[in-house]
Amino acid sequence: MAYPVFDLHCDTADRIGWATLDLDLRFTAGTDGYFPGDETHPQDFDLIEGNACAISLTKIGKTPWAQCFATFVPDEIPAVHAARFQAQIMAHMSGQAMLNHDRMVNVRSASDIRPALKDGKVACIHTIENATFFAEDPALIEVLKSLGVLMSSLSWNAQGPLASGHDTHAGLTTAGIEALTQMEQAGMVLDVSHLNDECFDEVAARATRPFVASHSNSRTVCGVKRNLTDDQFRTIRDMGGIVGLNYCSEFLSNEATDETAA
C-alpha cells in the first residue's frame, strides 16, 4: 500500500495559471510566463492533469496525496493589485480541481483532507505565498479562509508591507502584526518560510497558535539564511507546528551543483 504524501508547498498553481492572468499583471510581474520560456510552449503549462511542472495528476498517479497549491504573489506586484492576482491564480487552480473532480477535491477545511485521501483523490489545499494585500484589506483574511485558503505567508524575499524576507533585516510592520492576529482568529495557518530571523522572532513572541514553515531546510546542514536554525526548528516544534522540506538543491547542500539539482 502506498504511503500518503502531504506536500506543504509547490509553485504549480502559478505556473499553470499564469496565462490566465490579466495582461497588466503579467506585465507588472515582468514575464509572459511564470518561468521565462514557458510562454513558448503554453500547452505544457496550463492543465493539472498533464504538464511539465513538478506536480501533475499524471505524476501523482494513484499515490494518496494532499497538496498545498500556493498562489505565489511576486514582490514586483504592488499590494494594491495583489488581491486580484491571487484571485485569478486561485480561480484557475480551483477550476482545474473541479474539472478533474473524479481525481481531485478542493479542500475548504482541514477536516476535508482525510476523507479525500480515503476516497483515493488528491486533496487540493489552497495557500498563499506573500499575501501583501492583507495590508490593503485585512478583511480578506476571513473571506479567503471561508473560501478555503488554509495557510499564508506574509512575505517573500524582499521587504514588504507586512513583513520582510531574508533580503533585509526589517521586522514585522504594524499591518503585519495585525494580519498575524487576524489569521489566528480566522484559523488560517501562518507560514514562516521566507521570513528573516527578525520577523521569525517577532512571530514566535506573539503567536498563540501553531505555525509552520512550508518549505525550509536546516541552516546547520546547509548554511543559507533561507534555512532555519536549530532554535527555530525547536520553536516551531514547541508551538505544535511542522516544517516541510525544500527540494531546491541550493538549500539542501553547501556543495549543490547543477548536476545535483532536485
Name the predicted role of every residue range.
Residues 1-154, 159-169, 174, 223-262:
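N-terminal hydrophobic targeting/anchoring segments and the immediately downstream early-domain regions
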Residues 5-13, 195, 213-217:
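Histidine-centered catalytic micro-motifs
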Residues 97-98, 171-186, 203-213:
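Alpha-helix-loop-beta-strand connector modules within alpha/beta enzyme cores
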Residues 104-107, 188-195:
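Catalytic beta/alpha-barrel core
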Residues 113, 136-141, 198-209:
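Distinct, well-ordered alpha-helical segments
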Residues 168-175, 182, 191-199, 203, ...:
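Short, contiguous, pocket-lining structural segments
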Residues 191, 212-214, 244-247:
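Short, conserved beta-strand edge motifs with alternating hydrophobic and charged residues
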